[in-house]
């Protein structure tokens, strides 16, 4: 018995979770296809690190994000070598550092049991292991957020750590400006938790560094903030606005796309979103908290998560720029929501009939949302499987399928029907889980720990299913023909492209965002800076001179560049560009270029030169 009490079971479970997280992250780092944001950040950052251009420089590269989003990965490549492999290995290091900070914080807030739970939530999350293993700013920001919270969250933090955390919060904002709302919340929390002296140090240090960053890049850094402010109220900032009609401004995006984006977010972040909602509903009264410090930490974390969630939900779902960014945007700040859950449930809950009823409704909504994510897999099946009783014209008792009801009564298109069917299937599974939870609690199969409370036991059951289902359902889906050789194949294709273009050539780029990182392997060639974006640098209308100053371009400029370029890199699927214009024009000569093994999992690029 003495050995059993000392056996480090929780520690072993935690370590196994960490090992699984590392293993899955390594897999995704070596197999995930590159995306436009990754390539654009890496390429622009490398150009900035080499001193060829500077962030916010007129007639340079479009700096639509805070400077450190480019400079940090840029200098990593400048110091350790340019390429996708080097950048992703750095992203892995940042991811593992973040995980260590999360473990430290959950231990502080909830103890080692919660630390083990959180470790496995990260390890089983496809979203966490895939996003944080790519060279994207989400991983940088999440790591900074985690460690500034290590420095500032809780009682009796040393003043030096409070100042360090405050400075790190500014560095975080200068990596992604969308985290700006966190700055005042952190300073207010430090005043509240650590007192006036610590608060003044926090305010002074963060304000000084914030001003210093702006002084370095003044005045063009105001491009970051001018787009957030109403143009009618701030005409004095028009010099920092491109005053252009972007291509995405003309898109017509239907509500189905928004609904599916929400479903993706629920599937990717089920534990955090559902757990956060449950923690709000069951939030314990102030007198039940173990300490005032934990209560203050929970309030701060909850307000931070809600503020950032609302801000990023508006930016994604209610704007045209990136509807499908609802889930990726949450990767910046989901740590705050996770720590809120730990903080609340490690201090107990407050339950009542009203809270219980509200919790059931919320859980069923999340179950329906999770079900709707799988509409392509279970949509058609659900339309036939779900049956409603009815009496036919002959007075006979029979059944009608959900598909028949939605077709003949509501006249809905098949795509909508499949989403409704999948959501209803998810809700029915949720009802089944409620019944299972009631049976377990009713017959006292769980008598200790969190199982003593029916509401918390039910929430735990839903969270368990929401964590386990995605990796189980998606097993094998992430494999590509390139498998874990993707980085090797990408490097081979990048070097082959570099070998095909002579030094000092002026290159016209019309590749996809997934191809941008191939440019990292090219030295001593010149590009038209506005073309090197993830597709967002193109505008439909605007003054050409003004656009060029901001690093943007339109059709008129594109035609001019086509006339002056030496080499042309073309992707067949590029909008407003027809590959046949180059293949059938005698002015352009095809250049032999073989993407070799990368062509198994990536679209082919075509290379031409001016005759």
Feature locations, PLM:
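Perimembrane helix-loop-helix junctions
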Residues: 2-5, 151-154, 158, 162, ...
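Short periplasmic/luminal acceptor-recognition loop of GT-C membrane glycosyltransferases, typified by
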Residues: 483-488, 498-539, 565-573
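Specific aromatic-rich, kink-prone transmembrane helix
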Residues: 101, 121, 140-157, 163-169, ...
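Membrane-lumen/periplasm interface segments of specific transmembrane helices
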Residues: 24, 195-284, 301-315, 366-392, ...
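Membrane-proximal lumenal/periplasmic loop motifs of glycosylation machinery
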Residues: 26-36, 50-71, 78-88
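Short acidic/glycine- and proline-prone juxtamembrane loop motifs at membrane-interface regions
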Residues: 35-36, 127-140
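Transmembrane-helix motifs of polytopic, lipid-linked glycan transferases
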Residues: 89-110, 143, 147
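Hydrophobic, aromatic-rich transmembrane alpha-helices
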Residues: 262-295, 299, 337-347, 356-360, ...
